[in-house]
């Protein structure tokens, strides 16, 4: 969808479609040193219930049009790992961040688990099942990237993000 160059790395915004019409935006941070001749290890990050992928990537906006955070906090795991030469993938939990836009537009919080869980149950999915499936689709895609060390991928989740992380593991 978009690529922005940062100091010593680039941020790529992608969308996965695990189900027809179900767009799952995610961020890919790739160090400038990564290439098909020099693949790098990968960190796959899943935020907590009240975090977004942008926070973990040290970004200030989903559209990447703003400069990155000048001094990201300790939980900006993707940012800190890419600065150490790793690639990092960051995916919001289902119903949060950009996937929670309907809630934000209605003036509520940035997540809507209850309605999403109800809709998913009506389609014979659970929230954890759908979130884990979407993450697995993205993880499978990562393994096809020439810059990724396919045998050196770490999964990390914060709080609620540990649930799909454990399913992926």
Q: What does each of the following model-derived ranges do?
A:
Residues 80, 167-168:
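Hydrophobic/aromatic ligand-binding patch that stacks against planar heteroaromatic rings
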Residues 38-39, 44-137, 143:
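Cap/lid segment of the alpha/beta-hydrolase catalytic domain
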Residues 141-148, 162:
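Conserved helix-loop functional segments at active or binding sites
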Residues 1-38, 42:
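N-terminal cap/lid segment of alpha/beta-hydrolase-fold proteins
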Residues 147-159:
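Alpha/beta-hydrolase fold nucleophile elbow
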Residues 16-20, 30-33, 47-50, 95, ...:
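Short, flexible loop/turn elements at secondary-structure junctions
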Residues 12, 29, 76-77, 138, ...:
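Short, hydrophobic/aromatic alpha-helical segments in well-folded domains
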Residues 157-167:
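Glycine-rich nucleophile elbow surrounding the catalytic serine of serine-hydrolase chemistry
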């Amino acid at each position: 969808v978009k690529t922005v160059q940062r100091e010593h790395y680039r941020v790529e915004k992608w969308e996965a479609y695990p189900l027809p019409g179900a767009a799952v935006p995610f961020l890919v941070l790739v160090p400038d040193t990564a290439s098909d001749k020099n693949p790098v290890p990968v960190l796959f990050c899943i935020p907590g219930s009240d975090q977004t992928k942008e926070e973990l990537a040290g970004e200030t906006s989903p559209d990447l049009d703003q400069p990155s955070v000048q001094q990201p906090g300790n939980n900006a795991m993707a940012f800190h790992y890419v600065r150490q030469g790793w690639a990092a993938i960051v995916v919001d939990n289902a119903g949060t961040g950009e996937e929670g836009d309907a809630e934000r537009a209605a003036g509520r919080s940035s997540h809507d688990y209850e309605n999403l869980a109800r809709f998913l149950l009506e389609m014979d999915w659970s929230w954890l099942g759908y979130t884990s499936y979407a993450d697995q689709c993205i993880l499978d895609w990562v393994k096809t990237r020439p810059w990724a060390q396919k045998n050196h991928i770490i999964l990390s989740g914060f709080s609620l993000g540990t649930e799909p992380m454990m399913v992926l593991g």
